[in-house]
């Protein structure tokens, strides 16, 4: 059995770690609330933009934008949004597992894949995973702006415009609630048709002055908005996962301290018993 002094040192070490994890839990909770506010503010815009674009994809247009044309998926691109930091449970691992499974299906179907990782963990993973990394971004912080993503996203849009990509997906952790974050893969291009069950007719639009000019701007803005929404959803998911992970670490540290305290008490009791025995033996010898 370890000595009482050694156990006391271990207890102090675990207590210091517990203070750190407890502080990180509180910081994550504060950041999560702010991230949720940003996510809630941008989600209606992204969802309504998706609905409008879905109607456009179903409409009858004289001008067919390349983003509306369905091509054979020979080359597939993934914009993968991860965290910059760790200590957030299995958030990134689950996301990467989902991407890898989907990539496997695409490769089995004969498609080539390339990646655009956003977030330091994603950049690190795909640099070692194998496959072409066309662009990347990291260090966006807890309050990213759309302008921080435009350059990276447009690299993938350029590849799609030039025909070097036939499909484009965005992958991120969707925030469900504090205890649940779900990795999702959403198709960006070609534009998916609206999935609303209540649609009973097709929408026709009048474009002024020119549908080509309007759609060029609108469709690019749509893709950028969906990627941005994925980033803010992922940040909210990250902070929620980190808060839960740090709470679990704090609770585990408390249990470990209790166990070590019990061992310490036993060691101290054994030391006292031994000292008493030595005193009694010494007195008997005299």
Swiss-Prot record:
Q: Name one GO cellular component term.
A: plasma membrane
Q: How does it sit in the membrane?
A: Peripheral membrane protein
Entry coiled-coil feature ranges = none
| Pfam hit, one | ATP-synt
Q: Which residues cross the membrane?
A: none
Signal sequence coordinates: none
The UniProt keywords, alphabetically, are: ATP synthesis, Cell inner membrane, Cell membrane, CF(1), Hydrogen ion transport, Ion transport, Membrane, Transport
Where does the record place it?
Cell inner membrane
Protein origin, superkingdom: Bacteria
Q: Name one GO biological process term.
A: proton motive force-driven plasma membrane ATP synthesis
- Name the InterPro entries for this protein: ATP_synth_F1_ATPase_gsu, ATP_synth_F1_gsu, ATP_synth_F1_gsu_CS
Query: What Gene Ontology molecular-function terms does this entry list?
Result: ATP binding; proton-transporting ATP synthase activity, rotational mechanism
The UniProt similarity line reads:
Belongs to the ATPase gamma chain family.
**What this chain does, per the record?**
Produces ATP from ADP in the presence of a proton gradient across the membrane. The gamma chain is believed to be important in regulating ATPase activity and the flow of protons through the CF(0) complex.
Q: What is this protein called?
A: ATP synthase gamma chain
Q: Which organism is it from?
A: Shewanella loihica (strain ATCC BAA-1088 / PV-4)
Q: What is the lineage of its organism?
A: Bacteria, Pseudomonadati, Pseudomonadota, Gammaproteobacteria, Alteromonadales
Encoding gene (name): atpG
């Amino acid at each position: 059995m370890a000595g009482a002094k050694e156990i006391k040192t271990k207890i102090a070490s675990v207590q210091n770690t517990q203070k750190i994890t407890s502080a990180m839990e509180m910081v994550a909770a504060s950041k999560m609330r702010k991230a949720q506010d940003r996510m809630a503010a941008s989600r209606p815009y992204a969802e309504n933009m998706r609905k409008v674009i879905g109607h456009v994809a179903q409409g009858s247009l004289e001008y067919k934008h390349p983003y509306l044309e369905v091509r054979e998926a020979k080359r597939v691109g993934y914009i993968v949004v991860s965290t910059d930091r760790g200590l957030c449970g299995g958030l990134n691992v689950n996301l990467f597992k989902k991407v890898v499974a989907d990539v496997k299906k695409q490769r089995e179907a004969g498609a080539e894949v390339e990646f655009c990782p956003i977030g330091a963990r994603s950049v690190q993973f795909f640099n070692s995973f194998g496959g072409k990394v066309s662009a990347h971004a990291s260090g966006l912080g807890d309050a990213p702006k759309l302008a921080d993503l435009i350059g990276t996203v447009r690299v993938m849009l350029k590849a799609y415009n030039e025909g070097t990509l036939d499909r484009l997906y965005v992958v991120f952790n969707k925030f469900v609630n504090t205890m649940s974050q779900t990795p999702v893969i959403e198709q960006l291009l070609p534009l998916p048709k609206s999935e609303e069950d209540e649609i009973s007719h097709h929408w026709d639009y009048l474009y002024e002055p020119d549908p080509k000019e309007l759609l060029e701007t609108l469709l690019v803005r749509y893709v950028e908005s969906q990627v941005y929404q994925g980033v803010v959803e992922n940040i909210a998911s990250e902070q929620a996962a980190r808060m839960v992970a740090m709470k679990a670490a704090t609770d585990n540290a408390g249990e470990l301290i209790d166990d070590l305290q019990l061992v310490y008490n036993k060691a101290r009791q054994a030391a006292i018993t031994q000292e008493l025995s030595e005193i009694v033996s010494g007195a008997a010898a005299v």
